[in-house]
């Protein structure tokens, strides 16, 4: 006589990220938007986060993990800290500012 060992069935589907979380903007849109280089794209990602039901938890967790960069909880993070806005890559444009030597 042999006894087959089987896992008990509960009738409940396994939890996935999609079933645990509501349709949050970062899970239904373009994920690259939250890690864009363009400051305008990052501002758009921040705006999409504004009505997110898990915004506060997202930001708290990102700060605890010291996320290196991206938009988390409606804020831009750079090296684990919140920054007001991301500067574009490259050197800032030189401003002549009325300096005749710069012309």
From Swiss-Prot:
Annotated InterPro entries: 4FE4S_WBL, Whib
Organism: Mycolicibacterium smegmatis (strain ATCC 700084 / mc(2)155)
Induction: By a considerable number of antibiotics many of which perturb respiration, redox balance, or transmembrane ion flux, including erythromycin. Much stronger induction by erythromycin plus the reducing agent DTT but not erythromycin plus the oxidizing agent diamide. Positively regulates its own expression.
Primary subcellular site in the record, as a coarse category: cytoplasm
Location of the 4Fe-4S Wbl-type domain: 25-82
Positions of disulphide bridges: none
Xref: Pfam families: Whib
PROSITE patterns for this protein: 4FE4S_WBL
Name under which the protein is recorded: Transcriptional regulator WhiB7
GO biological process: cell redox homeostasis; negative regulation of DNA-templated transcription; response to antibiotic
Gene symbol of the encoding locus: whiB7
């Amino acid at each position: 006589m042999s006894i087959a060992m089987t896992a008990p069935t509960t009738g409940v589907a396994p939890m996935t990220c999609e079933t645990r979380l509501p349709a949050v903007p970062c899970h239904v849109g373009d994920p690259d938007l939250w890690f864009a280089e363009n400051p305008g794209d990052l501002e758009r990602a921040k705006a999409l986060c504004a009505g997110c039901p898990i915004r506060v938890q997202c930001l708290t967790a990102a700060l605890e993990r010291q996320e290196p960069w991206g938009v988390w909880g409606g804020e831009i993070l750079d090296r684990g800290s919140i920054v007001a806005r991301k500067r574009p890559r490259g050197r800032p444009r030189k401003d002549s500012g009325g300096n005749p030597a710069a012309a």
